[in-house]
Curated annotation (Swiss-Prot):
Record's protein name: Neurotoxin LmNaTx34.5
Disulfide pattern: 29-81, 33-54, 40-61, 44-63
Predominant location category: secreted
Sequence similarity: Belongs to the long (4 C-C) scorpion toxin superfamily. Sodium channel inhibitor family. Beta subfamily.
InterPro entries: LCN-type_CS_alpha_beta_dom, Scorpion_toxin-like, Scorpion_toxin-like_sf, Scorpion_toxinL, Scorpion_toxinL/defensin
Pfam families, per the entry: Toxin_3
Role, per record: Binds voltage-independently at site-4 of sodium channels (Nav) and shift the voltage of activation toward more negative potentials thereby affecting sodium channel activation and promoting spontaneous and repetitive firing.
Residue ranges of coiled coil: none
Domain text: Has the structural arrangement of an alpha-helix connected to antiparallel beta-sheets by disulfide bonds (CS-alpha/beta).
Length: 83
């Protein structure tokens, strides 16, 4: 039982979501894109994710494998985007 608890503590929970701009004029907005998977993947990995891509229908970077506690995941609650 103790080994299971220790294993669960070591395993980091991952989360997926849209990347969020955290500074400047677009703070609180999703990171936008059109077709640039390379940019989204690089930005995702810089923020601790495993894979990022441009979700074409939403025109925003989507990141998989971010730490669950990441402040870089866009949510409606954090949406302070005015545009």
């Amino acid at each position: 039982f103790i080994l299971v608890v220790i294993a669960l503590m070591v395993i980091e929970v991952k989360s997926d979501g849209y990347l969020m701009v955290r500074a400047g004029r677009e703070k609180g907005c999703k990171v936008w894109c059109v077709i640039n998977n390379t940019y989204c993947d690089k930005d995702c990995k810089l923020k601790g994710g495993s894979y990022g891509y441009c979700y074409f229908w939403k025109l925003a970077c989507y990141c998989e494998g971010l730490p669950e506690s990441s402040p870089d995941i866009w949510t409606y609650e954090k949406n302070t985007c005015s545009t």
